[in-house]
Amino acid sequence: MTAVFITGATSGIGKQLALDYAKQGWQVIACGRNQPVLDSLHTQYANIFPLAFDVTDHPGTKAALAQLPCQPELWILNAGDCEYIDDGKMDVTLMARVFNINVLGVAAVIEGIQPHLSRGHRVAIVGSIASELALPRAEAYGASKAAVAYLARTLQLDWRPLGIEVTTIFPGFVATPLTDRNTFAMPMIITVERAAQEIKAGLARGVSQLYFPKRFTWLIRLLGALPYVWQGRLVRRLLKA
């Protein structure tokens, strides 16, 4: 039996991954802030071990990760949040909230799990295709996910000689409680079940970078390669489609 560690396991992609891996017989360490949801996951599958902590509480995160109920070989860092800035009116408090979860929270978990990592392990970090192209109102979210992507790629360079692999995941729009809050068109949005399938398949293949859905993420990457003066017009047209 193999084991997987998942943060952000109380909703969305993380919850679906926890359920899917548990169905396949994996031992799952499901992490999140919502203790009742974690307990319900354990009720559904005895091989799901709940671990409650808040990634923004860095000492608490380190303490929670000091001893684990099993030894994972796969680590999926999925916890994150999204807030938007309206009309380009900078809000440093909002920026700090988003970065504290999406960037420093990832770093806190990495610091906590690092003593448990060894040769043959894989760490997957969930970013966003938003890091590849500037999108309206995404000053905080997009910048945080760009930072996460850089962090993951740098860790890949430093950890590969140690036999530890890193996968950076770049999802497009996925139907989750997080995207339910969006008030704009979300082209080519996919279900959380499909997103979990894409992630599991990509990690099983051992890819270093995983983009999905392919058509949408390819389009975003293509737009990101165009001259900047064209990008804004095309992005606004795409998000109104």
What are these regions (language model features)?
Residues 10-11:
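Conserved glycine-rich cofactor-binding loop
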Residues 24-40:
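Conserved glycine-rich Rossmann-like NAD(P)H-binding loop of the short-chain dehydrogenase/reductase
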Residues 45-59:
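Rossmann-fold cofactor-recognition segment
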Residues 86-97:
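Substrate-binding pocket helix/loop in short-chain dehydrogenase/reductase
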Residues 110, 144:
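Active-site helix of classical SDR
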Residues 128:
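Residue(s) in the substrate-gating loop at a strand-loop-helix junction
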Residues 168, 184-219:
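C-terminal helical subdomain
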